[in-house]
């Protein structure tokens, strides 16, 4: 058990038997009355975000999640299929469970799948992924002096801003937490 004073962004807690991830929280001390903690919680199974208020010091059960390395096999409609790299068992997660993380996964990528009480509930992406640029405007000579950027569509369909010297076919490193370009790994 933890108290509402121990909350951190990304922490997983159990509320009414359901698992939630803390998106953001704020300690509030009103002029009159007791202090409280206002939170935004993401339901780990459905991906829905809701607001909940806890009394300061209120005890909450921390959700313990099991992590397993899995290989992403394929997507069929809104269903994403993964295979356990040790037991070769296959698991399916919905697009809602994966939230916006689908824009950075490609076939055969190794991903951490999160389980709670033996049931798969979400995934954890690597911090950095290397993806090919499938579409971007060509850079014009002299554009780099301003240090600007242009949008680029990646092989997974994600769109990120990249420097002008990046071309179609280049492989770039992207931070999955912020959706930002980090560096060019390999150019054409």
Curated annotation (Swiss-Prot):
Its main location: cytoplasm. Coiled coil: none annotated. Disulfide bonds: none annotated. One of its GO terms (molecular function) is translation elongation factor activity. Keywords: Cytoplasm, Elongation factor, Protein biosynthesis. SMART domains: EFP, Elong-fact-P_C. It is found in: Cytoplasm. It holds the Pfam family EFP_N. Pathway: Protein biosynthesis; polypeptide chain elongation. The keyword Transport does not apply. The keyword Ribosomal protein does not apply. One of its GO terms (cellular component) is cytoplasm. GO terms for biological process: peptide biosynthetic process. Belongs to the elongation factor P family. PANTHER family: ELONGATION FACTOR P (PTHR30053), ELONGATION FACTOR P (EF-P) FAMILY PROTEIN (PTHR30053:SF12). Involved in peptide bond synthesis. Stimulates efficient translation and peptide-bond synthesis on native or reconstituted 70S ribosomes in vitro. Probably functions indirectly by altering the affinity of the ribosome for aminoacyl-tRNA, thus increasing their reactivity as acceptors for peptidyl transferase. This is Elongation factor P. It comes from Natranaerobius thermophilus (strain ATCC BAA-1301 / DSM 18059 / JW/NM-WN-LF). The lineage of its organism: Bacteria, Bacillati, Bacillota, Clostridia, Natranaerobiales.
């Amino acid at each position: 058990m933890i108290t509402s004073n121990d909350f951190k962004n990304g922490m997983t807690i159990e509320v009414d038997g359901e698992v939630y991830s803390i998106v953001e929280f704020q300690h509030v001390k009103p002029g009159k009355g007791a202090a409280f903690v206002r939170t935004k919680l993401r339901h780990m199974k459905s991906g829905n975000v809701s607001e909940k208020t806890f009394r300061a010091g209120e005890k909450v059960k921390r959700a313990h999640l099991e992590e397993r390395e899995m290989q992403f096999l394929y997507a069929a409609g809104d269903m994403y299929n993964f295979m356990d790299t040790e037991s070769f068992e296959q698991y399916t997660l919905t697009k809602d469970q994966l939230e916006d993380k689908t824009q950075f996964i490609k076939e055969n990528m190794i991903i951490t799948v999160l389980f709670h009480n033996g049931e798969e509930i979400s995934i954890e992406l690597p911090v950095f992924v290397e993806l090919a640029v499938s579409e971007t405007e060509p850079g014009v000579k002299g554009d780099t002096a301003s240090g600007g950027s242009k949008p680029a569509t990646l092989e997974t369909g994600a769109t990120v801003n990249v420097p002008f010297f990046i071309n179609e076919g280049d492989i770039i490193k992207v931070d999955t937490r912020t959706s930002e370009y980090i560096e060019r790994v390999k150019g054409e």
